[in-house]
Amino acid sequence: LKILVLSHKPPYPILDGGCLAMARLLEDLLSLKQVAQVHYHTLATAKHPFEAEAFPVNEKLSVQHYPIRTNVTLVGAGISLLKQESYNLKRFKNQAILQQLQKELKNDDFDFVIFESLFAAVYARSLRPYSKAKFIYRAHNIEHQIWKDLAVNTKFILKKWYLQQLAYSLKWAERSIWSEDQGGLDL
């Protein structure tokens, strides 16, 4: 089997539970005899930078990272609010990264493409035409519920309203992903 994995942050070094879950999946894939190659693609942010030396050395593994700015801006948040799109997800989508992924899928035959979290799955719809692989969405959290809970516990009415909008847009995105993907794994 040949597998492409896209994550929204590097699994190594292991900084939190999400990193631990992604690292464990990668290690499990590499340990399977049926898996010939794992192409691991990861976004690298200021909060979660890429450290090549932290990844395991394995002849089955190739790693590609993409630096991306995901910092929150008032203008970006406002525009997303007006367009009724998820600002949480929009910050992780980048045209140059999409083109690199499309090129890799076009030039290589993968059996599976695994999207680690909703933030990586923002690329799924744009990548489908480039591969016959089965697409799998691996949910680490029910993201909209986290934001809904934040809204419930917020006193400031404007902030509460904005967090509710974020929760709603994430809920729509999660339902959309679940209805389109060919497989889903939740933790």
Each model region followed by its residue ranges:
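A short beta-strand/loop micro-motif in the catalytic core of glycosyltransferases
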Residues: 113-114, 174-187
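N-terminal subdomain of nucleotide-sugar transferases
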Residues: 1-64, 106-108
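Acceptor-binding helix/loop patch of EC 2.4 sugar-transfer enzymes
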Residues: 75-87, 136-172
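Short, well-ordered alpha-helical microsegments
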Residues: 47-50, 120-124
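A short helix->loop->beta-strand "cap" motif at the edges of active sites that frequently abuts
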Residues: 35, 130-134, 181-182
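A conserved catalytic-core segment of Leloir-type glycosyltransferases
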Residues: 40-104
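Short N-terminal targeting/anchoring amphipathic segment
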Residues: 101-121, 134-136
